[in-house]
């Protein structure tokens, strides 16, 4: 199983290197090449999606460590409720967990987004120096930690709502059979 995961990570890493090479070639191509702009536009789109999702209280992958390893989140459990054949109680409990998670995560997400904006402003306003950047990055990471903890801890609780069979079905639906879901 670890060999399978290592293979997946190696393939993803290799794909990233290949994509990086393609972008580099496009940047250095004669005639101006627009790979550079496309790469930055893709990064900006990702940053915009991050802001939208985190602003809504969602985790934007901050709980992958849990989800990939058999600790599902309530939102995805509800998305798969028919396949999981959730009982009425399970569905109600998952909804409560999701509501509580979003309620706690939204203000923490807003703090994270504000900390990220503050870091960007340091550079945009040309006032960045080592001390200011270190302080701003520390603030960003404190805020990110708080958002991430909300999501990871909710995944811990959500796991207990499901039977072993439901966890297996969930994991296969979300991740294939790459990791144990016990």
Residue ranges and their predicted role:
Residues 1-9:
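Bacterial N-terminal signal peptides that target proteins for export
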Residues 2, 19-22:
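Conserved, well-structured beta-alpha core segment at the onset of a catalytic domain
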Residues 9-18:
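Bacterial N-terminal signal peptides
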Residues 23-182:
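Charge-rich (acidic/polar
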């Amino acid at each position: 199983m670890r060999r399978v995961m290592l293979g997946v990570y190696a393939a993803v890493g290799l794909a990233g290197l290949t994509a990086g090479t393609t972008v580099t070639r496009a940047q250095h191509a004669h005639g101006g090449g627009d790979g550079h702009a496309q790469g930055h536009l893709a990064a900006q789109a990702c940053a915009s999606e991050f802001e939208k999702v985190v602003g809504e209280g969602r985790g934007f992958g901050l709980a992958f460590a849990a989800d990939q390893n058999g600790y599902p989140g309530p939102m995805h459990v509800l998305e798969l409720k028919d396949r999981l054949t959730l009982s009425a109680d399970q569905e109600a409990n998952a909804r409560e967990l999701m509501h509580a998670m979003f309620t706690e995560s939204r203000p923490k997400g807003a703090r994270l987004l504000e900390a990220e904006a503050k870091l960007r402003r340091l550079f945009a306003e040309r006032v960045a120096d080592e001390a200011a950047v270190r302080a701003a990055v520390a603030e960003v990471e404190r805020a990110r930690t708080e958002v991430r903890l909300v999501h990871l801890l909710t995944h811990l609780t959500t796991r207990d709502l499901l039977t072993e069979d439901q966890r297996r079905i969930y994991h296969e639906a979300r991740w294939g059979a790459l990791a144990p879901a016990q």
